[in-house]
Structures are given as structure tokens and as C-alpha cells.
Amino acid sequence: MTLSDDPISPSTQESSNSSYVRSKEAEKNSPSQETDEEVLKGYESYRENPSNYDNDNILIYTDTFNLYDDMFEGSLDSTRNFGAQKDPNVLVMQRLLHNSGSLIGVDMEQDGIDLATLFADSTEDSKLPYVIYEGLEMQGEGYGTNTRGPFENKIDIGSFGKSGSVMNVEREKEKIVMIPTPRFGNATPQWTIKKKLSSYDIRPRCGRLILQSSSFNEHIGRHLPKDQMIKINVGVNVNVYDYDTGTLHELRLEYQRQYGLAHGWQEDFVRRRHLKQKDEIGLLWDFSSSRLQFGVISRNTGPGLWETKD
């Protein structure tokens, strides 16, 4: 059916309004008698003069909108009326802009109603703006936007789909609790032997770190292999790891009236670490590597010997 030709009802004047309405209903339900040739002529007329058929606004007559049903269904007749409805409400829908098959924006308004004022005065139902926002949904190209009433909506939700999902994302953001990444500091070794250096320990002529027999037997001697303990009188080589500097040194563990570390103690530790009298050091036996670990626990801030000459 073309946009300019409307089927003419019977020319006989109806005697009453009821008979006129029945004839119009019968006319609407009857199939179109237009031929293919007439339809093609209508298309050609539109193609040659499209401005005759275009307007800035489209008048749509429809009943009260349903929140979950499509708002606009059917087709416009020759007068551009959206079917025959009871008690129609006239809405003005401006043209829809499309981007890759999704609606970009829809403006709907009714005379005398201002959305901002309506929401500001909605003291009876505080959830009204939220319900309307939840009712909006995108159904793709060719569909309208559902709403509960004739409000002016200017919402751009792009191609996100249902606007309810956008609100769900916002709610999830509020639930996120930032947990700081735990930082594990370097655990200080549990020194099993602690000693404050004496003047004898730092003298170059002695060149030995003296260890008490009880401390040596409990924390070092019982962990050494038997073949090394047999040679302890003449001395056995052991690795000593400096925990503070991360360096590995080889010293000689020996027994000469007292247990002690020699052959490298003066050069690799006293001089290199600038040790002085009353500095506190720590030692422990590392089972995993079969070696000693060394560390400086505290420094003597007062006067004390660093190096003496005989």
C-alpha cells in the first residue's frame, strides 16, 4: 500500500455513527487490493521525491506503555497514525540514531512534563526514578525504549545491552575491597651463639675468634661429621656465610686449649667488617648447607678497640 493512496470506503453515506465505525473496521481488516504495479509506482514516487514523505518528527498514537513489552508495534497508515487506539496519548519521538545496529539515544517528551521537576517532586515514591531506569532496555535496531510513563529520557547506554546490567556493574564496584599486598621482610636468623667481642678476639697477633666449649659442643660440634670431629685438634676447614654482606668465606675450625675460628678471621671479618671491642656478633649452624652463618647483631657506639698493636 502506498503512502499517498488510501482505499476509499463505500460512497454510500452511513446513516449512523455505529454503522460508520463497523464499516471502517471491516475496511481495515480487508486485504489490500493493490497490484504489484501500483506498489512499485509508489516506491518510485518516494525515491524521486523523498522530501514529501520525510518530517522531523513522527507522530505515534499508542496506549499506555508496558514496561516489558515493545512500545511500538505495527505499521503507520496513510495518515501516519499508528493504528486505531482507544484514548490515544500523543508522543513525539525524534529520529533514532543508529551505530552498528544499536540505538545511541532516544528523546521522548510530553507537553507540560519536565523530568527533572518530576523526579524532584516525587516524594510519594522515592524509588520511582530507579524503577524507570531499570525498565529501560536495548533490543537492537528497530525497537523503541520501554518506560513506565511518558517521561523525557535522555540516556545514552550505547551497546551495553540492558541498563540494569550497567547498574549491577556499579554495585559490584562498591563491593570491591582493596587488600594490600603483603610484604614479607627478611627474617633475622635466630642466632644460637651470641658473643660480645673481647680485645683478644680482635688482636692481630691472636687472629682467632674464641668460642666457649659449652656453646661449641651444643650448637656446632654435635652437628659436625665424626671424621671432622676427630681432626678438630689439628683443625678442619668450614665455610662461613656472612649474612649481612651475602659473602662466603672459608675459615679453619680448631681446638687449642679453646675452640676457635682462625686462618682468615682477622682479614675477612675483623678488618673487612670493621669490628671492634664490645660489638655483638651471632653464629649458627646452617643444617641445609652444612656451614656456619655469621652476622653483626649490634655495634659498640662508645670507645673501644678496633685494632691493637703489641
From Swiss-Prot:
According to the UniProt record, where is the region Disordered? 1-39
Q: Is Transcription regulation found in the keyword set?
A: yes
Q: Which UniProt keywords apply?
A: DNA-binding, Nucleus, Transcription, Transcription regulation
Compositional bias per record (Polar residues), positions renumbered to this chain:
1-21
Which residues mediate DNA binding here? 205-300
A GO cellular component term found in this entry reads: nucleus
Here the disulfide bonds are none
Note whether DNA-binding occurs among the keywords.
yes
UniProt-listed InterPro entries: B3_DNA-bd, B3_domain, DNA-bd_pseudobarrel_sf
Localization: Nucleus
Q: What is this protein called?
A: B3 domain-containing protein At4g02870
Organism of provenance: Arabidopsis thaliana (Mouse-ear cress)
